[in-house]
């Protein structure tokens, strides 16, 4: 100890001279030395430090830093260090270029078919049959005699052009989406700070500013941002599984294993380290470089590997890769992650770490709906083509009895190509490729706006899942309460003080114990700083409960800092840090005479049980019997708790000098036989806005439960203040022990039936451990008591909340109080730790659902009308009234633009006035079905009237039966124009889906909507007036325009008529877009794990499932082999630590499946058996191994189906899984 003090003193003297002398950055240790040192482990590292540098302080001296004061913080010095040792930043993978996104958008099957048809049409249009044979080829050539032949190429060219438009729009959408995510990443990066000592001051700096030589303070729950060597530690335990795959926590100490590695988690204790490697030179950085985060060669290898893989896997993965717009090396790494990343982990952790299946209800429903609509569209388009071809063949060769002439063949083919294009056009309009786009836009827009409501969304689909939430399990401290704690009552020298006593009232020796005990037995990182603003409240830094105790000392006019200066942190002999199992903290001091004194603080009932004495009124210790303890509980602790106070007991124990050295590792023998100093009551007031927010939740059909570590009386009092409990209601409040007793059988196993008896009535779970929280969440999610599977949101802030946060449908981590580990496991980070922000998330989630429904209502109306018009028109008049190019324009309005317009509606409070939709609620309600069919009826009547009687009404030439390549007719232009205007006005109707009357309500709050509607109208005018031949349009007069607009506006009036008809009367209406019902699932599947099977998967029969299991198994083996091969090429990378937020955030390749430390990312645990890189061979305890295999297998089919039915490539539904 003294040695260290001298060291720092000596250092302080030379510090400045060293800095001046070495202005060229000539440190006593090179980057290569540091890297080599950090790659060693435990004893090797110690040996190397001792041989080369003497000790840690030797390294500090060479790095020109003081172990006590830290760096000076001088900008020139920091710059020099960054130049020599690098910055703490890992360069992200280059984003996809716009051209790459364009190429991806071109992969769409429908677009490819159209391109081929257009090229064939182009080629054939240049063929002229020999003169004289014209008459023999039938009416084909009528148009050509009028000199129209040379314009035949225009249609083909126009189709190509519109395909280009669609591709550009899709690519632009993807590009802006990727840009947005990158912005979000950098935001998360900037928010992550770490505590370092600079110039003797403890400050927080952004992780990217940490540099080699910094002295960093590490504490429980931190995620280490750089590599370092321990200078001083208290009971420090690190989870290194993200780097080594070993799940046991590693104990770090100066004499055994002082190396701390970036990307690992501090699970217990605290300490200080000197930073030795940052950025790409840290262990995490080295692995990232191996994985090709920066390397060009790796990218090329990836390309090759991907090509091979795509061939082998039938292109199915190609789609998945597309979906994950920022994939990169993630695919290659998946097997490595799962094999080497933390196998034999504890059971509950393992379960929590299996990827969450059936994450997004909406995706499942939409996939199913899109596939159904796609199939119908394919059928319609096929029938259309067959009818057209048959009609033409019969008419030409049968009725007109024409011979087949060789020179007429190209003209006949031209006809067939025209029919084919009409068929494809029907398909283009029928396939709702805008659905995935609408979902993505809606979610991306919501995510952006949710930032303002203090929700930082890390996984897109969490936002939508929140709309379905039926239960919220919330922490108490900081979420429901203000987390500004103050001691308001105390039991000292056998008196219960209702307010803090004057220091004179307390015997001096008791006061002395109190001051020393609180000062040294609170983490040295906890302190009270002066207010930022004049007249404001003092700032509490660190653990808020400890700050309350330090505040008590200030109220007693004593300064804790004096004690800490006298006993610096290094002088503490042993520290038993606080964790959720101990629920207490103890610190041992060694006195000059060789005796020891231990101070303990913790939950009052836990510490009091260990007290055998108590300090009496005169300051002497007297015997403390169980009877006395019960008295204190009844007269002091329970009254405090019933007022909502958290009770903390402070105690101490002396170990005399003469006795043999205590066995310090045997904590139970050390922390016992204590003497009680005092019991204090700490108040943490309820946030004023919480009761109202909870009322909103209850009105919205969401049950709020409180899970807390506090004692049951405190918890009950706070729950009543918040409105979670109402006096006189029959709800349960349980303690963790009681809860466990009720849900376990004689063997101590948890039984679902027992949980099912408890959770519906449970409102408060007190004195609970993180395991209890996980058990409760799992129990509610797995329960089958209610018709609907519960959707559970959970808040968490501690390191051990990880499993519960992962198990929940949506995990909320605290942005302020939360540890990095909790943030890693979460889906959404609450930047203000406030419960009301969760209510906002519910609102946004429901809004996403409604936005998608609005879009569906609009899109399906257009689909129905366009398909029927194209089909009937083609069958009756041999030509689609809406040409291919016009259909593509309609498709653009209806897909891309409408999804933008309708998916960006802001949410309103009224969303909280209804119950959650539930998992099986159909996407298209009966009211929506009524609207869709009603509007489709109106539009079809208008279009067919114009088609078959329009020429008489407007007194123009009929456009029906026009020959090939005839010029565009006014007649068909009016049909097209009216059709588009009806869609435009119907877009306004689509804004309301619950049968509201006023469709204009709040329309001006949505600027995007207004811009798109007006913009579309302007473009429509340009197309009709100046589009000419390419768009098959001829100019219209003012009168014709007015008629078109009038018929378009008719949809608004018609909408009012429809909303007057009560839906309940229309018994024949069916809902659509269901989640899947139970009877559709084979029984074995249900038995495996009912709710873990994805909606879209349930359609598949058992045979298919087995078949895909086989396929998937092969696919996985290929994937593992490839990964293994790549790992050999790339210098046998170690499994990377994706677990650090700042790294994870800089790397798009890890954005996809999120950076959960030990998740087997191959979707099935089966695969791990084949994995050559596997370390521990114990099979993971998965509740449903087979199911996982089914899972990925079927994922595959849906992707195939989807690609077959043309989903717009840049945004297949799975792009939603892009983690933020």
Curated annotation (Swiss-Prot):
Cytoplasmic side: 2-105, 176-366, 440-855, 904-927, 992-1005, 1061-1220
A GO BP entry: regulation of cellular response to insulin stimulus
Catalytic activity as recorded in UniProt: Ca(2+)(in) + ATP + H2O = Ca(2+)(out) + ADP + phosphate + H(+)
Segment forming the signal sequence: none
Pfam families xrefs: ATP_Ca_trans_C (PF12424), Cation_ATPase (PF13246), Cation_ATPase_C (PF00689), Cation_ATPase_N (PF00690), E1-E2_ATPase (PF00122), Hydrolase (PF00702)
Subcellular compartments: Cell membrane; Basolateral cell membrane; Synapse; Presynaptic cell membrane
Entry EC number(s): 7.2.2.10
Extracellular topological segments: 127-154, 387-418, 877-882, 949-971, 1028-1039
Binding site for Mg(2+): 475, 477, 797, 801
Region entry Calmodulin-binding subdomain B, spans: 1118-1127
KW Transmembrane (keyword) present: yes
Region (Disordered): 297-356, 1160-1220
Entry GO CC: basolateral plasma membrane; cell projection; immunological synapse; intracellular membrane-bounded organelle; plasma membrane; presynaptic membrane; synaptic vesicle membrane
Enzyme class per UniProt: translocase
Disulfide-bond pairs as recorded: none
CDD domains xref list: P-type_ATPase_Ca_PMCA-like (cd02081)
SUPFAM superfamilies: Calcium ATPase, transduction domain A (SSF81653), Calcium ATPase, transmembrane domain M (SSF81665), HAD-like (SSF56784), Metal cation-transporting ATPase, ATP-binding domain N (SSF81660)
Biased composition (Basic and acidic residues): 312-325, 337-356
UniProt xrefs under SMART domains: Cation_ATPase_N
Family as reported in the entry's similarity comment: Belongs to the cation transport ATPase (P-type) (TC 3.A.3) family. Type IIB subfamily.
Subunit structure: Monomer. Dimer. Oligomer. Calmodulin binding. Interacts with PDZD11. Interacts with SLC35G1 and STIM1. Interacts with YWHAE; interacts with the monomeric and dimeric forms of the YWHAE but prefer the monomer form; this interaction inhibits calcium-transporting ATPase activity. Interacts with NPTN; this interaction stabilizes ATP2B1 and increases ATPase activity; this interaction controls T cell calcium homeostasis following T cell activation. Interacts with EPB41; regulates small intestinal calcium absorption through regulation of membrane expression of ATP2B1.
Function: Catalyzes the hydrolysis of ATP coupled with the transport of calcium from the cytoplasm to the extracellular space thereby maintaining intracellular calcium homeostasis. Plays a role in blood pressure regulation through regulation of intracellular calcium concentration and nitric oxide production leading to regulation of vascular smooth muscle cells vasoconstriction. Positively regulates bone mineralization through absorption of calcium from the intestine.
Protein name, as recorded: Plasma membrane calcium-transporting ATPase 1
Species per Swiss-Prot/TrEMBL record: Sus scrofa (Pig)
């Amino acid at each position: 100890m003294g040695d260290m003090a001298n060291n720092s003193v000596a250092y302080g003297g030379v510090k400045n001279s060293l800095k001046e002398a070495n202005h060229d950055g000539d440190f006593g240790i090179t980057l290569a030395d540091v890297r080599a040192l950090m790659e060693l482990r435990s004893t090797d590292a110690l040996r190397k430090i001792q041989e080369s540098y003497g000790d840690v302080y030797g390294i500090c001296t060479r790095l020109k830093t003081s172990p006590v004061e830290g760096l000076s913080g001088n900008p020139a010095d920091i710059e020099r260090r960054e130049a020599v040792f690098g910055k703490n930043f890992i360069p992200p993978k280059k984003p996809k270029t716009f051209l790459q996104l364009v190429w991806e958008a071109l992969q769409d099957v429908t677009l490819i078919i159209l391109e081929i048809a257009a090229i064939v049409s182009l080629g054939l249009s240049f063929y002229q049959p020999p003169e004289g044979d014209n008459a023999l080829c039938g009416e084909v050539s009528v148009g050509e005699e009028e000199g129209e032949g040379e314009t035949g190429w225009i249609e083909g060219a126009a189709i190509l052009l519109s395909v280009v438009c669609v591709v550009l729009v899709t690519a632009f959408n993807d590009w802006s989406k990727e840009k947005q995510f990158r912005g979000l990443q950098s935001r998360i990066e900037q928010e992550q700070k770490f505590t370092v000592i600079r110039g003797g001051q403890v400050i927080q700096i952004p992780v990217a500013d940490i540099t080699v030589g910094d002295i960093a303070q590490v504490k429980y729950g931190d995620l280490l941002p750089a590599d370092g060597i321990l200078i001083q530690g208290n009971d420090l335990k690190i989870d290194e599984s993200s780097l080594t795959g070993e799940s046991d926590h590693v104990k770090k100490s100066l004499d055994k294993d002082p190396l701390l590695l970036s990307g690992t988690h501090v699970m217990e204790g605290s300490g200080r380290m000197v930073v030795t490697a940052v950025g790409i030179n840290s262990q995490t950085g080295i692995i990232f470089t191996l994985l090709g985060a920066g390397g060009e060669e790796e990218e090329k290898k990836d390309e090759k590997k991907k090509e091979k893989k795509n061939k082998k896997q039938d292109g199915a993965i190609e789609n998945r890769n597309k979906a994950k717009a920022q994939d990169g090396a993630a695919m290659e790494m998946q097997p490595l992650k799962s094999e080497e990343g933390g196998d034999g982990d504890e059971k509950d952790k393992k379960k929590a770490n299996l990827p969450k299946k059936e994450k997004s209800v909406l995706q499942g429903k939409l996939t199913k709906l899109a596939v159904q609509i796609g199939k119908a569209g394919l059928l319609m388009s096929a029938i259309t083509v067959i009818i057209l071809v048959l009609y033409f063949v019969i008419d030409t060769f049968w009725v007109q009895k024409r011979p087949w002439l060789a020179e007429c063949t190209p003209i006949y083919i031209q006809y067939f190509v025209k029919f084919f294009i009409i068929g494809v056009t029907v398909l283009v309009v029928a396939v709702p490729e805008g659905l995935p786009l609408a979902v993505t836009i809606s979610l991306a827009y919501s995510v952006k706006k949710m930032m303002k409501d203090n929700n930082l969304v890390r996984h897109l689909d969490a936002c939508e899942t929140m709309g379905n939430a039926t239960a919220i399990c919330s922490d108490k401290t900081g979420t429901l309460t203000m987390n500004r704690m103050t001691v308001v009552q105390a039991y000292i020298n056998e008196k219960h003080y209702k307010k803090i006593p004057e220091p004179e009232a307390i015997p001096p020796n008791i006061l002395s114990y109190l001051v020393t005990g609180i000062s040294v037995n609170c983490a040295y990182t906890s302190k009270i700083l002066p207010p930022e603003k004049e007249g404001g409240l003092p700032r509490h830094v660190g653990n808020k409960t400890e700050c309350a105790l330090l505040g008590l000392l200030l109220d007693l006019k004593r300064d804790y800092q004096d004690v800490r200066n006298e006993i610096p942190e290094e002088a503490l002999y042993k520290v038993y840090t606080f964790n959720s199992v101990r629920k207490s903290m103890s610190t041992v001091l060694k006195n000059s005479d060789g005796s020891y004194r231990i101070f303990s603080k913790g939950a009052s009932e836990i510490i009091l049980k260990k007290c055998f004495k108590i300090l009496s009124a005169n300051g002497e210790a007297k015997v403390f019997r169980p009877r006395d303890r019960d008295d204190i509980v009844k007269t002091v602790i329970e009254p405090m708790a019933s007022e909502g106070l958290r009770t903390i007991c402070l105690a101490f124990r002396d170990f005399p000098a003469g006795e043999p050295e205590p066995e310090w590792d045997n904590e139970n023998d050390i922390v016992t036989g204590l003497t009680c100093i005092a019991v204090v009551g700490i108040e943490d007031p309820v946030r004023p806005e919480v009761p109202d927010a909870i009322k909103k939740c209850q009105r919205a059909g969401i049950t709020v439960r409180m899970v807390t570590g506090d004692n049951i009386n405190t918890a009950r009092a706070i729950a009543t203040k918040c409105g979670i409990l109402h006096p006189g209601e029959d709800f349960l409040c349980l303690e963790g022990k009681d809860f466990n007793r009720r849900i376990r059988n004689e063997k101590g196993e948890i039984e679902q039936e027992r949980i099912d008896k408890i959770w519906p009535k449970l409102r408060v779970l007190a004195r609970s451990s993180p395991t209890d929280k996980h058990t409760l969440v799992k129990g509610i999610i797995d329960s089958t008591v209610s018709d609907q599977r519960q959707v559970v949101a959970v808040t968490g802030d501690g390191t051990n909340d990880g499993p519960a946060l992962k198990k929940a449908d949506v995990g909320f981590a605290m942005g302020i109080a939360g540890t990095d580990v909790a943030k890693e496991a979460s889906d959404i980070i609450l930047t203000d730790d406030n419960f009301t922000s969760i209510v906002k998330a519910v609102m946004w989630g429901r809004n996403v659902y409604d936005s998608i429904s609005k879009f569906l209502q609009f899109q399906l109306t257009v689909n129905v009308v366009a398909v029927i018009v194209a089909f009937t028109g083609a069958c009756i008049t041999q030509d689609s009234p809406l040409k291919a190019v016009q259909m593509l324009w309609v498709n653009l309005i209806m897909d891309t633009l409408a999804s933008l317009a309708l998916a960006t509606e802001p949410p309103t409070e009224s969303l909280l006035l209804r119950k959650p939709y539930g998992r099986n609620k159909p996407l298209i309600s009966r009211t929506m079905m009524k609207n869709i069919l009603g509007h489709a009826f109106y539009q079809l009547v208008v279009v067919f009237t114009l088609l078959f009687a329009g020429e008489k009404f407007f007194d123009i030439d009929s456009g029906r039966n026009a020959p090939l390549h005839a010029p565009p007719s006014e007649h068909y232009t009016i049909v097209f124009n009216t059709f588009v205007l009806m869609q435009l006005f119907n877009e306004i109707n689509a804004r309301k889906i619950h049968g509201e009357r006023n469709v204009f309500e709040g329309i001006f709050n949505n600027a995007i909507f207004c811009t798109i509607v007006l913009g579309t109208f302007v473009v429509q005018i340009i197309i009709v007036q100046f589009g000419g031949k390419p768009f098959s349009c001829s100019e219209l007069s003012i009168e014709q325009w007015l008629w078109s607009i009038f018929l378009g506006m008719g949809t608004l009036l018609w909408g009012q008529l429809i909303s007057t008809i009560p839906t309940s009367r229309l018994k024949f209406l069916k809902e659509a877009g269901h989640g899947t019902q139970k009877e559709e699932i084979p029984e074995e599947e249900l038995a495996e794990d009912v709710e873990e099977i994805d909606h879209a998967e349930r359609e598949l029969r058992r045979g298919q499932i087995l078949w895909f299991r086989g396929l998937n198994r092969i696919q996985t083996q290929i994937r593992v082999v490839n990964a293994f091969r790549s790992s050999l090429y790339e210098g046998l990378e170690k499994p990377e630590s994706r677990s650090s937020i700042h790294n994870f955030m800089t790397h798009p390749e890890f954005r996809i499946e999120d950076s959960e430390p030990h998740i087997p990312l191959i979707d099935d645990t089966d695969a791990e058996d084949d994995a050559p890189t596997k370390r521990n061979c114990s099979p993971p305890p998965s509740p449903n191994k087979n199911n996982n295999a089914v899972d990925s297998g079927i994922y595959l089919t849906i992707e195939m189906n989807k690609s077959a039915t043309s989903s717009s490539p840049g945004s297949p539904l799975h792009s939603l899984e892009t983690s933020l």
